[in-house]
Amino acid sequence: MPYGTRYPTLAFHTGGVGESDDGMPPQPFETFCYDSALLQAKIENFNIVPYTSVLPKELFGNILPVDQCTKFFKHGAVLEVIMAGRGATVTDGTQAIATGVGICWGKDKNGELIRGWAVEYVEFFPTWIDDEIAESHAKMWLKKSLQHELDLRSISKHSEFQYFHNYINIIKKFGFCLTALGFLNFENAAPAVIQ
């Protein structure tokens, strides 16, 4: 029996950072720092598969903090994510990294929810920052990107934008920062029937 394409119906938001004095070329921050960031985000035991940023309306109201979902995690499973994550090397002049994910929902002419989008943000800073700076920069850039998603499609905003952010001030040689949405539950669209 055929089945249609999958779409997520339950998601969680999470974030993590990692740093290390050790790493392997050509991107030393991808080795130990990335693993540490995944551990802090509580998704270290998944096989991570990145998505682009289109959200079905079934996710509206169904994006939870990671701590509400960890009891359902399966070691070695595939986790599909929308992730803003990057690493940096202090010797390249980066002292801090901020990341974020923003979500917007669109409505039709009758005000009904129709669909959503997520956008990612990454910024490198030449000095240390604090949470206020990380949050304000993330919101500024994510808001601009979310509005672009709606304007590009001539769709009106259904509800307030949602923002999630994270940051790291790098003390060691290498650092990594990530903010992510992970998708846990799925349904299938109706299968295509070609006549």
UniProtKB/Swiss-Prot annotation:
One of its GO terms (molecular function) is arginine decarboxylase activity. It is an enzyme of class 4 (lyase). Keywords: Cytoplasm, Decarboxylase, Lyase, Pyruvate, Virulence. PANTHER family: PYRUVOYL-DEPENDENT ARGININE DECARBOXYLASE. The gene is aaxB. It is found in: Cytoplasm. Binds 1 pyruvoyl group covalently per subunit. It comes from Chlamydia trachomatis serovar A (strain ATCC VR-571B / DSM 19440 / HAR-13). This is Pyruvoyl-dependent arginine decarboxylase AaxB. The lineage of its organism: Bacteria, Pseudomonadati, Chlamydiota, Chlamydiia, Chlamydiales.
